[in-house]
């Protein structure tokens, strides 16, 4: 069944590749006939492709909607060509400028601090916190974007290990195809950013009590193993819980991306210079990362202050129990929206796993005949499930 997802995305990719190839070939012929500036045109085409590839479907959707709305106005002659062109040029500049905004966070020779975070959500919060503190000139940011709780990490620091991880995600996680088409390129960019950290910069690796950030922290230290910089490891979740929680107002953060940027600012300031690791500490955590990359499983949990490998089916009974406890509308004949079930599972799960893994296991339970489906399993909002009768 996994091949269904893979083939669906292969068809999509093939169409994109054909389109890019046709555009490129058209420009080559035009350039040869006219200006001879083939190299510049091709460079522009692939710059556009790179800019859009780095955005998720939800990020791209508003741009597409705006473009279609402008085309509609032009067709109906409610907008002049000059006005429409001006708006589209502004949109183009904004979209292409996103790459330049990302470059602002790369380590530079004059920076004094480099923050390393795990996950896009926490990276966004950290950027807002650093902007709020007014220290973006000297404080830079590197994000490890992987969800280390799921998918194979065997040999992740080798090309074949990364290829295996990418293949698993493309075959099992619905929205992963685009994200893993340039996995190798992104990994090499990560290594470049690590290499660019200047000797004088203090490195702060942020983590918290979940598998994703704990394994990610160990991976970060492995990548930093040859750097001579001062390295600290800090837990913003633990800090914020201790500082802000009261008996009548208590928040337990499951991952750092849940922390508001204003509270994160306080953590950055007050944890400055704390959590320093000695050489032995770093060596121990590097060894732990190497052991993790010897495991062949696809699911890990955080338990007893350790990253533990568990079976892929570990959460199946938990999902089924949640399904049994929810009451679907009478009109739906016992079928429950999968998005509601997954939302319930995430809301009560002590582990930070992510909705994509729960959705993957839900589809596996359907394929195994444990559940019945109504709809199409293209994304969780498109189908409902119930126990097979």
Predicted regions and their residues:
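Long, hydrophobic/aromatic-enriched structural stretches that serve as scaffold segments
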Residues: 171-218
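A short acidic (Asp/Glu
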Residues: 124-129, 152-154, 213-221, 243-248
């Amino acid at each position: 069944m996994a091949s269904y997802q893979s083939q669906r995305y292969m068809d999509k990719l093939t169409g994109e590749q054909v389109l890019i190839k046709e555009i490129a070939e058209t420009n080559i012929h035009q350039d040869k006939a006219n200006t001879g500036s083939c190299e510049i045109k091709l460079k522009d085409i692939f710059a556009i492709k790179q800019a859009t590839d780095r955005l998720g479907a939800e990020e791209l959707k508003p741009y597409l909607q705006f473009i279609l709305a402008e085309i509609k106005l032009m067709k109906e002659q409610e907008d002049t060509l000059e006005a429409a062109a001006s708006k589209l040029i502004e949109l183009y500049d904004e979209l292409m400028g996103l790459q330049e905004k990302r470059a602002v966070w790369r380590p530079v020779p004059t920076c004094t601090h480099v923050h390393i975070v795990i996950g896009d959500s926490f990276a966004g919060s950290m950027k807002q916190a650093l902007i709020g503190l007014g220290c973006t000139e000297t404080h830079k940011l590197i994000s490890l974007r992987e969800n280390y709780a799921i998918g194979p990490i065997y040999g992740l620091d080798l090309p074949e290990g990364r290829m295996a991880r990418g293949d698993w995600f493309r075959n099992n996680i619905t929205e992963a195809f685009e994200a893993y088409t340039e996995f190798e390129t992104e990994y090499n960019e990560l290594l470049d950013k690590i290499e660019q950290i200047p000797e004088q910069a203090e490195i702060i690796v942020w983590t918290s009590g979940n598998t994703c950030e704990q394994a990610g922290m160990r991976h970060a230290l492995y990548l930093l193993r040859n750097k001579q910089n001062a390295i600290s490891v800090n837990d913003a979740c633990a800090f914020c819980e201790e500082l802000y929680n009261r008996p009548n107002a208590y928040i337990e953060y499951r991952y750092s991306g849940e922390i508001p940027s204003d509270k994160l600012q306080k953590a950055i300031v007050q944890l400055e210079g704390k959590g320093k690791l000695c050489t032995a500490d770093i060596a121990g955590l590097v060894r732990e990362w190497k052991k993790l990359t010897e495991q062949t499983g696809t699911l890990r949990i955080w338990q007893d202050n350790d990253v533990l490998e568990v079976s892929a089916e570990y959460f199946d009974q938990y999902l089924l129990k949640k399904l049994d406890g929810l009451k679907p509308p009478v009109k739906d004949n016992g079928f429950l929206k999968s998005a509601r079930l997954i939302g319930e599972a995430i809301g009560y799960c002590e582990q930070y796993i992510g909705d994509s893994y729960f959705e993957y296991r839900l589809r596996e339970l359907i394929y195994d005949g444990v559940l019945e489906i109504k709809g199409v399993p293209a994304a969780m909002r498109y189908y409902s499930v119930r126990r097979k009768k």
